[in-house]
């Protein structure tokens, strides 16, 4: 898969736009509440050879030879915006739709087809033929790009109500279908205060602002959220690869959310029983899904600069489950407990702590590795101002070794101006 198809695309507008997007859900019938549908939320950079995740989506859509999957790529640029249109390096709504359709067929789907909604054809989201197409399918996959494009193409009017197509997808989800997405396609599943963009260091300094912004540094959010399919907490993608732990903490603090789910690249959070009586969450894929718990967090202000203490951090890896009502991590069977070895701390403080799995590395190489690592941390690369992160073992700290990544729970995060 071309690298540029894995990257998030920003779309410029002239001014910040304050928006509100209702989830517009219709109460499900009693029969729907008994089971519900499924979500598969991928943190971006979804490798085309990640058999575990693709086959899971096909399974949830009815299984090999039965699954019929609709591909939605409205977050991508349209062909006229793509300088590589018509080449193997294309990255646009049409070629991405064809690409994913072929990929899902290669993983056993009986059929996979593009749903023709994009910025060139927003009216298609109210076309009865498109609604009939959606009603014939058993699963859906939303591609990456800019999640705000999903808002502009699939919601309607000043009140941002569901288009006919989105309402049909919502009904299918309640009725048992799977809805999956990667990067922006996962982000759009979120409920209120969905993030629209923003860099970590400016976001920490200036705080979160409602709306969609041309400046990619502004930490923006939509107060009424995305499609509202996933409401157990805020969602962020490309999480530890892009060091988004801190920006998510600031957004959650400013919008008074107690929990954030951070999805790493090439990794998925599977949610089954959506809208049903029992909802289950588990992790699949290469890296991890972070859960940030702000229930006991407190905002500080050193020298008038925002800071926070007491954020609890857990990270689940492949096979782990999460009990959302209990805020509890359940490590997968067979994972061995990691016991810190006796001795002084050898973990090196990070000089770029909000980037490229730096904070995960501090836990794995510090808190989980040596008893002498009472606290680990580092500073931000940016220096206007420079930020410091401090990680300590909280009550109930534990780490477990997985095949490709380490599960941990009970890490406490503090962030302040350096």
Segments the model singles out, each with a brief description of its role:
Residues 147-162:
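Glycine/threonine-rich flexible loop motifs
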Residues 71, 81-83, 100, 111-116, ...:
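Divalent cation-coordinating acidic motifs and surrounding scaffolds
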Residues 1-30:
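Secretory targeting and sorting signals
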Residues 89-91, 106-130:
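Functional beta-strand-loop-alpha-helix junction segments that form "active/interaction loops"
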Residues 158-171, 207-210:
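Cysteine protease catalytic core and zymogen-processing segment of caspase-like enzymes
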Residues 134-135, 173:
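A short, aliphatic-rich alpha-helical micro-motif
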